[in-house]
């Protein structure tokens, strides 16, 4: 009864809401969100530096999130690279001195806070040619004015960056009097033109005063109240912002420290000075403001302009624009032709006569329609991760942000279960289900930033290995059973795997190796194909006639294993192979193939394990040792129970080991050899009981059919900044933002999967002469792209 109600309910839902309806809704949502963000940027401004300097919130303890953009955490080498031959000056009171110390410690963590506090403090890194000075001027007075005036008159002494601020001493010395505030306004007014003049050629920041924790203030500081601080800040802002009447002031207000202090001042030791973690955050913000445009970190979107379009991107834009125009012209012509062929009414009988000519969908129409849709989708990709239209945020990991969504999807997956069409081991529905739930877990892992939690990282590594295991299992099974080593099959698989990634490499200006998983499965597919296609070609049909063919296949697999082992422990040989042009253009990342070697080596044996498992399974199946009937256990009851017990123990043992990992490098070294234990254990647990083989989760299987597209699309339209951050379509509401962005992301992935399938039917013909002509055109196309890419790379140097 429950099953009947479920099926009726599902039909009712599908009647009113289909995948097509979902995609239309997603398109409307994208257009509305794009319009809202565009209007917001027109109204509030498009400068993310202003947001970085003025707004933000804490994601968690000590993790600051600027409004609308991502903040990069600078390493020592990056800071020195940015500040080479630069002079930075901090001028002000003890709070500015604290900021100076935190800034210098980014460059040199060993720098100590020592010496007389009420005097100038110099810092110089001669090797990096970086000079940072603190100048003790606790009040805005004639002394500070004279110092600033010298900089305006002497270009040699003038710093590249000036960070200034003072007020608490004026409040303290004059006991918070109104006369002191009036004098402060006069002094600020007198130095404002000088700061504005400096700001034309240098970066000038005025640091607004942070609030105090009045309960902790000593008796001689009790007059420094938050009310007084607000009055002094208001005076500084109004005067400095009005120092130029013709345009916006070039002196930047560093007001974000106030927000940071509001959350952390309770941790202060004296109620006046901020704790070290807060100072470090403010110093890192300063570093981002000045250095992001120089270093251009991927995970630092604040203060970075939109990257200029490359020649290849411009050509791609022209191609997609022409495709869209071409499709609309084709559509108008086709519609007019359809109107002419409308059913007409017979004058005698009054009945409609239907046109018996049914025009088939042409290859040209499929091509134009597919590229039209793909062009619009790529425009969305570009808007999300290149055009700075939508906002981005940093990831922040908590256990709840990872495990609660996992529980949600598991409940949904269990709820949507159906009977399988067949009950064989790793049948199609089951492998789709396996891919689906693994992909959903990996997506949650990426968006939650769970890679920082080692036990989760190690289990996710097994899921990635399981994908590669399926690659070995699936491709070996196909070639072994069907013996189809034709070029058509190879082209189909390569097109299915690589089409989206190649388009993204062109549109998003990213190297092929950036989407590391696709090169990985592509290379392993070719390795399996070459291993089995080379003479002698051994298939199941041939091996059944002579047992020695089995030995021949095992010899081939043994040689493959030997090659894998050699390349895994010979980094030099591996890098020489993949550093050859044009392979280097495909497998290099930032001028090195090390990343490719690391990725390949991390799961080097699991594809071989998949091939070996498929060989053993098919051999057992051929000899009818397995019982794969509906509801039947895979083996006899005793053997099945024993294998189930061993599998459960092995599965849990691996999880306990992975959860107890302390060192990522050591665990990664063991992972290639031991990941197969949990994979095979899972397969046996899932397939030995007959009832488990007979059902599958249609929810997970649906996602499994588009798992490749989900994995690739997440880089730019769900995550952001090339997976380093999170895309923000709806600011201020993280839960609603995730729901909306996920909905659009899944719809896009599904549509791209359909586009790839449609194009594969047209682009890859079954007759060899046509196929070879297409291959020649493809080679010429990639040759042109590689040449243009090489020219672009040289122009960037």
UniProtKB/Swiss-Prot annotation:
EC class (word): transferase
Please state what the protein is called: N-acetylneuraminate (7)9-O-acetyltransferase
Explain the post-translational modification.
Answer: N-glycosylated.
Cytoplasmic side residue ranges read 1-18, 335-363, 417-439, 483-486, 535-546, 621-638, 693-698, 747-770
What is the primary gene name for this protein? Casd1
- Per the UniProt topology annotation, the Lumenal ranges are 40-313, 385-395, 461, 508-513, 568-599, 660-671, 720-725, 792-797
What is its subcellular localisation? Golgi apparatus membrane
Keyword list, A-Z: Acyltransferase, Glycoprotein, Golgi apparatus, Membrane, Transferase, Transmembrane, Transmembrane helix
């Amino acid at each position: 009864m429950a099953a009947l109600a479920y099926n009726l309910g599902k039909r009712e839902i599908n009647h009113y809401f289909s995948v097509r309806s979902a995609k239309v809704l997603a398109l409307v949502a994208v257009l509305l969100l794009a319009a809202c963000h565009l209007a917001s940027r027109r109204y509030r401004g498009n400068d993310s530096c202003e947001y970085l300097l003025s707004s933000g919130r804490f994601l968690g303890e000590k993790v600051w999130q600027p409004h609308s953009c991502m903040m990069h955490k600078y390493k020592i080498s990056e800071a020195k690279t940015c500040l080479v031959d630069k002079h930075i000056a901090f001028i002000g009171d003890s709070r500015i001195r604290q900021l100076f110390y935190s800034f210098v410690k980014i460059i040199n963590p060993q720098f100590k806070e020592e010496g007389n506090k009420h005097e100038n403090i110099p810092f110089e890194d001669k090797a990096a040619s970086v000079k940072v000075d603190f100048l003790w001027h606790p009040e805005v007075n004639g002394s500070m004015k004279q110092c600033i005036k010298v900089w305006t008159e002497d270009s040699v002494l003038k710093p590249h960056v000036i960070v200034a601020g003072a007020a608490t001493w004026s409040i303290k010395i004059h006991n918070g009097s109104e006369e002191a505030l009036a004098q402060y306004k006069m002094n600020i007014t007198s130095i404002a033109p000088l700061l504005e003049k400096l700001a034309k050629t240098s970066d000038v920041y005025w640091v607004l005063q942070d609030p105090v924790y009045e309960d902790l203030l000593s008796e001689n500081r009790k007059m420094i109240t938050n009310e007084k601080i607000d009055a002094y800040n208001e005076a500084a802002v109004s005067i400095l912002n009005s120092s130029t009447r013709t345009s916006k002031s070039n002196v930047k207000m560093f007001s974000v420290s106030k927000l940071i202090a509001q959350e952390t001042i309770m941790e202060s030791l004296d109620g006046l000075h901020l704790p070290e973690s807060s100072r470090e955050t403010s110093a890192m913000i300063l570093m981002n403001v000045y250095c992001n445009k120089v270093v251009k970190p991927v995970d630092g979107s604040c203060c970075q302009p939109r990257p200029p379009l490359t020649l290849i991107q411009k050509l791609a834009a022209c191609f997609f624009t022409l495709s869209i125009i071409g499709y609309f012209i084709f559509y108008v012509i086709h519609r007019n032709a359809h109107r002419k062929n409308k059913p007409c009414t017979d004058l005698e009988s009054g009945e409609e006569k239907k046109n018996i000519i049914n025009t088939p969908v042409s290859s040209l129409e499929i091509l134009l329609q597919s590229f039209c849709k793909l062009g619009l989708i790529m425009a969305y990709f570009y808007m999300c991760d290149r055009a700075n239209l939508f906002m981005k945020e940093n990831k922040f990991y908590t256990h709840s942000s990872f495990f609660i969504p996992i529980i949600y999807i598991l409940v949904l997956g269990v709820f949507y279960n159906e009977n399988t069409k067949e009950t064989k081991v790793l049948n199609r529905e089951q492998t789709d289900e396996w891919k689906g739930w693994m992909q959903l877990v990996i997506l949650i892992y990426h968006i939650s930033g769970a890679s920082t939690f080692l036990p989760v990282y190690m289990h996710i590594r097994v899921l990635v290995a399981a994908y590669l295991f399926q690659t070995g299992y699936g491709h070996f099974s196909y070639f072994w059973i069907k013996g189809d080593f034709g070029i058509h099959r190879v082209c189909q698989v390569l097109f299915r795997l690589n089409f989206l990634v190649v388009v993204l490499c062109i549109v998003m200006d990213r190297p092929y190796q950036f989407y590391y998983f696709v090169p990985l499965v592509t290379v392993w597919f070719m390795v399996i194909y070459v291993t089995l296609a080379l003479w002698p070609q051994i298939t199941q049909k041939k091996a059944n006639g002579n047992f020695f063919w089995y030995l021949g296949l095992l010899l081939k697999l043994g040689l493959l294993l030997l090659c894998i082992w050699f390349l895994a422990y010979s980094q030099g040989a591996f890098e020489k192979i993949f550093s050859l042009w044009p392979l280097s253009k495909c497998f290099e990342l930032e001028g090195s193939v090390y990343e490719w070697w690391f990725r390949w080596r991390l799961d080097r044996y699991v594809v071989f394990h998949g091939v070996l498992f498929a060989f053993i399974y098919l051999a057992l199946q051929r000899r009818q040792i397995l019982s794969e009937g509906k509801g039947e256990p895979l083996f006899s009851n005793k053997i099945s129970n024993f294998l189930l017990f061993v599998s459960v123990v092995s599965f849990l043992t691996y999880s306990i080991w992975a959860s107890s990992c302390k060192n990522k490098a050591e665990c990664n070294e063991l992972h290639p050899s031991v990941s197969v234990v949990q994979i095979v254990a899972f397969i046996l647990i899932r397939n030995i009981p007959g009832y488990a083989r007979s059902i599958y989760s249609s929810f997970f299987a649906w996602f499994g059919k588009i798992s490749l597209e989900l994995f690739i699309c997440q880089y730019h339209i769900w995550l952001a900044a090339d997976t380093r951050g999170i895309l923000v379509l709806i600011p201020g509401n993280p839960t609603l933002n995730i729901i909306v962005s996920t909905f659009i992301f899944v719809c896009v992935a599904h549509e791209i999967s359909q586009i790839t399938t449609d194009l594969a039917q047209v682009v890859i013909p079954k007759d060899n002469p046509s196929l070879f002509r297409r291959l020649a055109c493809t080679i010429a196309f990639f040759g042109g792209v590689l040449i243009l890419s090489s020219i672009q790379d040289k122009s960037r140097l």
